[in-house]
């Protein structure tokens, strides 16, 4: 039996690696660089096309618990991320190019057959297993085949933030600080008074946007909502979103600014910064004009403009079984954002679940469902079995795990205990290599 993994993104790379080190014959299909997408810039595997942040490391945050669960699984992606971390307060952020380089290196050294070409359809095969992990930038031709196969798909749109050079920032205005003084001052802050905010706001809501083919506002996922759309929902909306000043004190005045634009390190060398929460579909000239209205960024050099792109996912509740296989073709699995999970590590988690069950099937064992007491189990239960027939993409969050008044540390403790027991029962750890994957880089 061969396992074909379609897409070398975060989930596809994780799956291919985990199955290969367990002795399965793995063929990884990736169309880049022979065919690029509108948002990818390199030929590396696991390229991060939106933020470089993998979110909070705190166990009190859902993403923190998810990371602990991935560590129990032995996640390659998380180990490489920690190896490529850049300072980001309580969050885990990475040097995106170094991260993708290291993942690519490991994949190429793991005995995986790599095929660089666009796959337009899945051929009929009675023996092989196929895992579709093509992600949010699935090619049009493959999406057409997929539409015929599942009878349903949906489109929504992602937007990414601009990146500027560090040496074009005016540090006499911009200052380092974390909210409430908690952290390592990893963020730069551009303060605004009310007049400056009003000027910025008026320019933003009146700026020209790029038309996006088939754009439907209702199918835009909230986290990547363009800043201009947030602004148009109300003049103060940005003050409760990406420009929230709460807990940030300007050392020049000793006071909290009216509004704050935050900048986060984009690489280890600290030569680049992304503008946090400034995903946009504005025309490039408009982006340049509006960014330079931000105090301290009057001479900002923009090395990547914000862009918006189509994002594809299936209605997993209708077409997948509890093990993420097609109901009408159990040789085809799905993983990653195409299933309706949202977020980098959420995609990895779905991939690990699929990999575990493909590994069990290869040993003639029955697939298993994850405990519902775990973050990963609750997330996948939501996308596979939610009561609403219309699936909206979902992040890991504690709300999936029961009443809001539950003690999060106790919930996390139970989740990790139950996952450890599950992984022991499933014999997952017995099949894997446990040494530090990135040793020697």
Curated annotation (Swiss-Prot):
Main location: cytoplasm
Record-given protein name: Methylenetetrahydrofolate--tRNA-(uracil-5-)-methyltransferase TrmFO
Residues spanning the membrane: none
Catalytic EC class: transferase
Catalytic reaction(s) noted: uridine(54) in tRNA + (6R)-5,10-methylene-5,6,7,8-tetrahydrofolate + NADH + H(+) = 5-methyluridine(54) in tRNA + (6S)-5,6,7,8-tetrahydrofolate + NAD(+); uridine(54) in tRNA + (6R)-5,10-methylene-5,6,7,8-tetrahydrofolate + NADPH + H(+) = 5-methyluridine(54) in tRNA + (6S)-5,6,7,8-tetrahydrofolate + NADP(+)
NCBIfam families assigned: gid_trmFO (TIGR00137), PRK05335.1 (NF003739)
Function description: Catalyzes the folate-dependent formation of 5-methyl-uridine at position 54 (M-5-U54) in all tRNAs.
Subcellular localization(s) per the UniProt record: Cytoplasm
UniProt binding sites for FAD: 7-12
Family to which the UniProt record says this protein belongs: Belongs to the MnmG family. TrmFO subfamily.
């Amino acid at each position: 039996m061969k396992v074909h993994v379609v897409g070398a993104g975060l989930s596809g790379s994780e799956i291919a690696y985990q199955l290969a080190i367990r002795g399965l014959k793995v063929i990884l299909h990736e169309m880049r660089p022979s065919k690029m997408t509108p948002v990818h810039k390199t030929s590396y595997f696991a390229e991060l096309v939106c933020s470089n942040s993998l979110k909070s490391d705190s166990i009190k945050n859902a993403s923190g618990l998810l990371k602990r669960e991935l560590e129990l699984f032995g996640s390659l992606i998380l180990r490489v991320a920690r190896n490529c971390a850049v300072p980001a307060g309580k969050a885990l952020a990475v040097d995106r190019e170094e991260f993708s380089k290291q993942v690519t290196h490991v994949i190429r050294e793991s005995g995986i057959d790599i095929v660089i070409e666009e796959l337009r359809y899945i051929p009929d095969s009675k023996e092989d297993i196929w895992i579709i992990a093509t992600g949010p930038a699935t090619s049009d031709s493959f999406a057409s085949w997929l539409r015929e196969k599942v009878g349903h798909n949906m489109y929504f749109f992602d937007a990414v933030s601009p990146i500027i050079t560090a040496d074009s920032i005016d540090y006499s205005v911009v200052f380092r600080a974390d909210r409430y003084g908690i952290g390592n001052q990893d963020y730069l802050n551009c303060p605004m008074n009310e007049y400056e905010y009003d000027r910025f706001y008026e320019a933003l809501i009146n700026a020209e946007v790029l038309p996006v083919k088939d754009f439907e506002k209702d199918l835009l996922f909230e986290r990547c909502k363009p800043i201009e759309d947030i602004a148009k929902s109300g003049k103060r909306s940005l003050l409760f979103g990406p420009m929230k000043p709460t807990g940030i004190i300007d050392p020049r005045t000793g006071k909290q600014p009216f509004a704050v634009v935050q900048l986060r390190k984009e690489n280890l060398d600290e030569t680049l910064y992304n503008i946090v929460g400034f995903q946009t579909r504005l025309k490039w000239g408009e982006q340049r004009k509006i960014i330079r209205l931000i105090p301290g960024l009057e001479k900002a050099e923009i090395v990547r403009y914000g862009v918006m792109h189509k994002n594809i996912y299936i209605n997993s509740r209708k077409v997948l079984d509890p093990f993420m296989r097609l109901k009408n073709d159990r040789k085809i699995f799905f993983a990653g954002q195409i299933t309706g999970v949202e977020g980098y590590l959420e995609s990895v988690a779905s991939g690990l679940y699929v990999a575990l069950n493909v590994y069990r099937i290869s040993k003639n064992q029955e697939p298993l469902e994850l405990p519902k007491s775990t973050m990963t189990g609750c997330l996948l239960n939501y996308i596979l079995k939610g009561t609403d027939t219309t699936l909206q993409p979902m992040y890991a969050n504690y709300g999936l795990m029961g009443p809001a008044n539950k003690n999060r540390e106790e919930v996390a403790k139970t989740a990790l205990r139950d996952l450890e027991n599950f992984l022991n029962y499933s014999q997952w750890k017995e099949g894997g290599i446990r040494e530090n994957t990135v040793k020697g880089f």
